[in-house]
From Swiss-Prot:
GO biological process, alphabetically ordered: protein quality control for misfolded or incompletely synthesized proteins; rescue of stalled ribosome
HAMAP family (alphabetical): Pept_tRNA_hydro_bact
Protein name: Peptidyl-tRNA hydrolase
EC number(s) from the headed UniProt entry: 3.1.1.29
Gene Ontology CC annotations of this record: cytoplasm
The species this protein was found in: Bordetella pertussis (strain Tohama I / ATCC BAA-589 / NCTC 13251)
Gene that produces this protein: pth
Keyword Hydrolase among UniProt keywords: yes
Residues of the site described as Stabilizes the basic form of H active site to accept a proton: D113
Similarity comment: family membership: Belongs to the PTH family.
Amino acid sequence: MRRVLYFTNTRPDAYATMSDPIRLIVGLGNPGPDYETTRHNAGFWLADHLADDLRTAFALEKGFFGMLAKARHAGENVVLLKPITYMNRSGQSVGAVACFYKLAPEQVLVLHDELDLLPGQVKIKQGGGHAGHNGLKDIQAALGSPNFWRLRIGIGHPRSLGLAQQVADFVLHPPCREEQQQIDTVIDRCRAVVPAMLAGDFALATRELHGANGT
């Protein structure tokens, strides 16, 4: 059972350094029960919790090639999206939604699994490359810009975890119990700072998340 953390409205003047507020939150993953518990679906896991926190629910929107949830936070519209195009075609869904709502890349936050961070670690980043993550690569092509925000949820790398698996196999398998607990803890930390990101205060969100990484 998912624990719900209802967001409270936060006044914009509570934040000192502001970026563009986030209006589209995209959780990356693969659709269907075969993939539900796999590491590659960490973005879906967080998106599901955020829908609960924002008191909304996902529904299929075929025209957007994904599951969509609409919410209000601090008087503003927020859209949550889980593409059902499979990871490699995520941009088809993200591009369609961003175009319809006339959103700039800077107003988009993508939640995704990150091989270069260990389970229990998380980082916020804007722009940059895709580091071989095909979902990010396709979104960058669809938006015509790398300047969207990313919330990188650490899942570890087979090499860093002492496993002999190939990366393609690793991301399509569930984490072990200890790793899952570490990822779940990170997801709760992310949920706690999403209100700041929705208000555009990525400086606060970054301090809170990166400071708790212990790195």
